Amino acid sequence: MKNEIKYLYSDLDGTIVSWNPKTEFVYQNKSYKNFHEVSDATISAFYRLQQKGIKVGIVTGRDYCRVLWLEKQLRTGLPTITLDGAIIFYQNEILSQTYLDDRFIEGINNIVKRFPEAAYKLNSGWISYFTKNPSVIFEIDYAFLGYFNPNTKLQKKFIDSTENWDLNKLKVNQVYFDIDTCPLAMQKEIIELISVSDVNAKIYEHSMYIIKNGVSKASALQSLNQFAIPITKDNTIVCGDGDNDIEMMQWAKHSVSLIGSNPKCFALAKYHTDSVDNDGIANWIEKNLLC
């Protein structure tokens, strides 16, 4: 197996980044959990893989503001796939991006005008458009933008929920709602709009995010061939734990999941390892790719 592998792509949260980090960082006099915390064992394993000639990349549902610093820490050499495949970044440029249809964004615009208290963001390339409404989720985004990315192309801008958006200028890769700020009537309208639109939505306890239908981590990995990166399902191993990793587990010949993962993701993976808090991925790499 190890002689086949030329590329390794790993998810972040729950895979190599713990949901319970041990460290914090301080931004504007407030402490935040450091979801950039990666163990020394993982950093070492990734570095030694690359020394061996196996290239390493990140594939995540995160916004790039929560990834860019990790690229440097892990010294990745492949394009970074963000927003579950909606944007691919490489060498400080956008390599590829997929937009939601203008008609869908117009529908979202009409809904938020009726519920101006809701907190959400529109991800658009290097720019994240936020409302000014209070949100625990987006407050953390502000902190990550300000603390880890002060001198990058990443930008934070604010959008007015009461205005008609200029869809000739506003091209959106992802819509992300803080569900805790959205009235039930609003949530119902959003779900109804989703049901008649060409979109893919992930709905969790506190959040909902929406990207173009057909876009996934797997589709993004497959698209890298058009950029002269000869990734195939046979020469790539993927690591993941969540429901948004299922399609890439189905695509790749070689896949690793961890104890504590989404049950379907875990069942689909070819190989299994210990939990993220016990350095599962690093240990698996040591035993199977660096031996």
From Swiss-Prot:
EC assignment = 3.1.3.-
Which cofactor(s) does the record list?
Mg(2+)
What superkingdom heads the lineage?
Bacteria
Tell me which species this is from.
Mycoplasma genitalium (strain ATCC 33530 / DSM 19775 / NCTC 10195 / G37) (Mycoplasmoides genitalium)
What SUPFAM superfamilies does this protein map onto?
Answer: HAD-like
Q: What is the designated name of this protein?
A: Putative phosphatase MG263
Annotated active site residues, numbered on this chain, are D11 (nucleophile)
Quick one: a GO cellular component term?
A: cytosol
A Pfam family assignment: Hydrolase_3
Instruction: Note whether Magnesium occurs among the keywords.
Output: yes
What UniProt keywords apply to this chain's record, in alphabetical order?
Hydrolase, Magnesium, Metal-binding
Residues that bind phosphate: L12, T60, G61, K217, N244
Q: Which family does it belong to?
A: Belongs to the HAD-like hydrolase superfamily. Cof family.
What Gene Ontology terms describe what this protein does at the molecular function level?
magnesium ion binding; phosphatase activity
List ligand-binding residues for Mg(2+).
D11, D13, D241
Q: Which Gene3D superfamilies match?
A: 3.30.1240.10, HAD superfamily/HAD-like
- Entry-linked PROSITE patterns: COF_1, COF_2
Q: Which InterPro entries match?
A: Cof, HAD-like_sf, HAD-SF_hydro_IIB, HAD_sf
